[in-house]
Design a protein with these regions (language model features):
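Hydrophobic, aromatic-enriched alpha-helical segments typical of multi-pass transmembrane helices
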Residues: 114-119
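Hydrophobic h-region of N-terminal signal peptides that target proteins for export
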Residues: 10-19
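N-terminal leader/targeting segments and the immediate start of mature chains
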Residues: 19-56
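A short, amphipathic edge element
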Residues: 45-47, 100-113, 152-156
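Sec-dependent signal peptide recognition
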Residues: 2-11
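N- and C-terminal low-complexity/disordered segments
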Residues: 26, 46, 71-72, 79, ...
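Gly/Pro-enriched, hydrophobic low-complexity segments
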Residues: 121-207
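An acidic-aromatic
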Residues: 56-100
Length: 209
């Protein structure tokens, strides 16, 4: 029995070492190509969204989904109803969802062990340098589309893939608490629009002195 345990730990150590030593660049490039290529990634864009908080796909009795109109400019600006939301981890979530982190020169990548998420085999990619704390992205092994993000105390599942202007994007995100595994936020994108420039009338935070 002791020999079996030792062998198991040895195999695990070997797998971890192989994952950490693998070159992540091909996986990063394939993930970008899977959604349409670098030129199709979003930089300035508008989202129309519907969302609610709770543990069920439908809002609790007496509650309704919230509507939101957002404008984002990667990497760090996000306006809701023309007001910039300021420092917020959600900006990094959006950069992961849009794969903007994969083209950030500050990003450092590392292959991490594969997982199985809801029956789907996923390959893992850890991102540091451009985001704190580190993010773990999991790409569907067959499609190489982003399926799951593990970050901070949550994990995110992305689904309902759609296509717009040559770009494939996940229109649905469900966020779960890592500790309990229970969902707490449901989000759907109802409209996506690529913008050539920021529209007029947006609030611009004053630079700190």
């Amino acid at each position: 029995m002791r020999t079996i345990i030792i062998r198991s730990f040895f195999l695990l150590a070997v797998c971890l070492a192989q994952a950490q030593s693998a070159d992540p660049k091909p996986l990063v490039e394939k993930a970008i190509q899977a959604v349409g290529g670098k030129d199709k990634l979003l930089k300035i864009y508008r989202l129309k969204e519907v969302f609610h908080f709770g543990e069920t796909p439908e809002p609790a009795a007496g509650k309704k989904r919230s509507l939101r109109d957002s404008i984002l400019s990667q990497p760090d600006m996000w306006w809701i109803n023309k007001k910039e939301r300021g420092p917020d981890p959600a900006k990094d979530d959006a950069r992961a969802w849009s794969l903007d982190l994969l083209v950030d020169e500050k990003s450092r990548f590392e292959i991490i062990p594969d997982i199985v998420d809801e029956g789907r085999k996923c390959v893992g990619l850890k991102i540091t340098g451009s985001v704190t704390p580190a993010m773990s992205l999991y790409l569907d092994q067959e499609t190489l589309l982003l399926r799951r993000l593990d970050w901070r105390s949550d994990f995110y599942r992305f689904s309902e893939w759609k296509e717009y202007d040559g770009l494939r994007y996940a229109s649905r995100t469900v966020i779960f608490k890592t500790k309990s595994g229970k969902p707490w936020f449901f989000h759907d994108i109802t409209e996506l629009e690529r913008l050539a420039q920021l529209p007029a009338g947006l609030d611009h935070p004053k630079a700190s002195k």
